[in-house]
Structures are given as structure tokens and as C-alpha cells.
From Swiss-Prot:
GO terms for cellular component: membrane. This is UDP-3-O-acylglucosamine N-acyltransferase. It is an enzyme of class 2 (transferase). Homotrimer. It comes from Aliivibrio fischeri (strain ATCC 700601 / ES114). NCBIfam families: lipid_A_lpxD, PRK00892.1.
């Protein structure tokens, strides 16, 4: 269990202590379930009423909310950011691996840095490079000439194919596959002819990738994920895709081949993005968005029909099928009015 005084935590968070800085906290809790030894946070004023009954040893709040608190306080401009930093300081998540397991296979010509941990039954193939402080979880596969950067963590059963490069301080969750073949085929009179995927996948620094996500290698050029990108679970990123730095992509999204997504974009869950298009910087696509064409102006975009009762939806669907007929009738009426 991690333990830290409020004064020490305030220094890490760049926060101001209001109350007893010697109080020790050891865990994060929600406001409704917090008890002595816990720290919680308030980032939305509509939950302010819960501060009266909160039993936490400390609360992270904005300065405007201090007067409503019954406990010690850490004052920050952004309490939600404070929550994230406090959670890091008190994190007790175990490491993917703690040393080099005897059951791990490591090729003789693989390069293993200082302080590397490799879990049971992991495979490190010829000329792969595992940089200082990297952690490779149990059952991982690191292909020939692949590179894993400093302090990067791979949880169990991650597959990194040949020549893939992953930068520093990245985190990849279990079951993810990086560098598998892109979906590339030619057609010879009805017979599919496989196109070997000759590119690779290049991932920058501080990238996080969720569980069971697949990132395909490029057909000729590389698939590129720039630094500081966060990618959720069960996402498909096809060959030759480029994702700009600082972008975020929620679960279940599919990005077709050769699409370029700009910097600081946010892609909502379950979105589908067509291939061979470009999305400019600063675009937000809400959940279940279907992007069929390029987006060259930043902003928020949505598609699809919001939730309705089944009865309402059936009526809407029926009307959609009649749009062409209604359009013809409307044009006929307009023509009569003009004549």
C-alpha cells in the first residue's frame, strides 16, 4: 500500500494545502465511498452537495469549493487532473514482469538493456532490441529486429511483429497485435493474390494502446502512430494509417487503410473511418461516427440517428425510404407554383 502525506502529495500535484499537511492518505476513492485514509476530488460543482457527508481525509477541489469542504483540502485549478496525478502517486498496479524469467526465450543476438524484465514464456527473436527499463509480460512475442523503447511496458500476450518500432514510455495492454499483415490483395480474374506487406509500424513515445487492438503493418510505407496518442480496446488500425500526436481514439473504432488523422483529434467509440482520406488537426468525431470523406476544417462532427423508441425508429426508417419519392413530389409542386 502506498502512503503519502498531503504536503508531499501537494508538491507532486503543484497544489495548495488547506488544513493539516501531515495527514497521510493511502488510496483514491469516490466521494460517496471515501473514508479515513482516502483522498477524493470534486471537478463538477453539481456534486458539491456531497461534500457535506464526505468522509475522506482530503478532497481535491477548486478554490471556489473550499468553503463547502468538511475535511482537509488540496486546491487546484483542475481537480480532475489532480485526481489523475494523485492516482499515479498512489498506484499499486503490479509490474508486467519483475525479472528475466528462466522460461523466456531470448535469441543470442537480441540486445537486452539494463534493468529489463521479461516474463515467463515470452519470446524475443533475433536482433530484437529491448531498451533499458522495458518490461515484457508473460507470453509476449517480440519479432526479429523489432525495437522496444526505454521504460515501455507490454502486458501479457502482446505480439510485436518483425521490424516494428515502439518508442519510450509506452504502455500496451494484453492481447494486442502490432505489425500483422495489412489487408492487401490483388484480384486475378476472381482469384485473390496476396500482396506481401513490406512496411512496418512505427510508434512514438508515451503512446498507450488498449487490449485486443490490432495495428497492421504498411503495404510499402509504414503505419505511423505519433507520440502521446491514446488508443482504446478492440480497435482496428489498417495498413499505412497515420495518427497525429495527441490524438485519442475510443473503443471499437475501425480506421481503413492509408487514412491520415491529424494531431489532437478525438475519435468517439464505434466510429468507422473510410480509407484513403485525410482528417485535419483538432477534429472531434462523436461516437458511432461514419466518416466517408475527408475533413479539412477542425470542429465536432456527428452522424447516425440518435436513440429512439423502436416504434419511433421504425417510422423514421420508413420515411427515409420514401425520401426520393417525396423529393419528386415536392419538385412537381414547386414547378406548378412557378408555372
Amino acid at each position: 500500500m502506498s502512503r503519502i502525506t498531503l504536503a508531499e502529495l501537494a508538491e507532486k500535484l503543484d497544489a495548495t494545502v488547506h488544513g493539516d499537511g501531515t495527514v497521510v492518505v493511502h488510496s483514491i476513492a469516490s466521494m460517496s465511498k471515501a473514508k479515513e485514509g482516502d483522498i477524493t476530488f470534486l471537478s463538477d460543482a453539481k456534486y458539491r452537495k456531497h461534500l457535506v457527508e464526505c468522509q475522506a481525509s482530503a478532497v481535491i477541489v477548486k478554490e471556489a469549493d473550499v468553503e463547502f469542504c468538511q475535511s482537509n483540502v488540496l486546491i487546484m485549478r483542475d481537480p480532475y487532473l489532480g485526481f489523475a496525478l494523485a492516482a499515479q502517486a498512489l498506484d499499486t498496479t503490479p509490474a508486467p514482469a519483475s525479472d528475466i524469467a528462466p522460461s523466456a526465450y531470448i535469441a543470442d543476438d537480441a540486445i537486452i538493456g539494463e534493468g529489463v524484465a521479461i516474463g515467463h514464456n515470452a519470446v524475443i527473436e533475433s536482433k530484437a532490441v529491448i531498451a533499458d527499463g522495458a518490461m515484457i509480460g508473460a507470453g509476449c512475442f517480440i519479432g526479429k529486429e523489432a525495437k522496444i523503447g526505454k521504460n515501455t511496458k507490454l502486458w501479457a500476450n502482446v505480439s510485436v511483429y518483425h521490424r516494428v518500432e515502439i518508442g519510450e514510455a509506452c504502455l500496451v495492454q494484453s492481447g494486442t497485435v502490432i505489425g500483422s499483415d495489412g489487408f492487401g490483395y490483388a484480384n486475378d480474374r476472381g482469384t485473390w493474390v496476396k500482396i506481401p506487406q513490406l512496411g512496418s509500424v512505427i510508434i512514438g513515445d508515451n503512446v498507450e494502446i488498449g487490449a485486443n487492438t490490432t495495428i497492421d503493418r504498411g503495404a510499402i510505407d509504414d503505419t505511423v502512430i505519433e507520440s502521446n496518442v491514446i488508443i482504446d480496446n478492440q480497435i482496428q488500425i489498417a495498413h499505412n494509417v497515420q495518427i497525429g500526436s495527441g490524438s485519442a481514439m475510443a473503443g471499437g473504432t475501425i480506421v481503413a487503410g492509408s487514412t491520415k488523422i491529424g494531431k489532437h483529434c478525438i475519435i468517439g467509440g464505434g466510429s468507422v473511418i473510410n480509407g484513403h482520406i485525410e482528417i485535419t488537426d483538432g477534429v472531434t468525431i462523436t461516437g458511432m461516427g461514419m466518416v466517408m470523406r475527408a475533413i479539412d476544417e477542425k470542429g465536432m462532427y456527428s452522424s447516425g440517428i440518435p436513440l429512439q423508441t423502436n416504434k419511433e425508429w421504425r417510422k423514421t426508417a420508413a420515411r427515409v425510404h420514401k425520401i426520393d419519392e417525396m423529393n419528386k413530389r415536392l419538385k412537381a409542386v414547386e414547378k406548378k407554383l412557378v408555372d
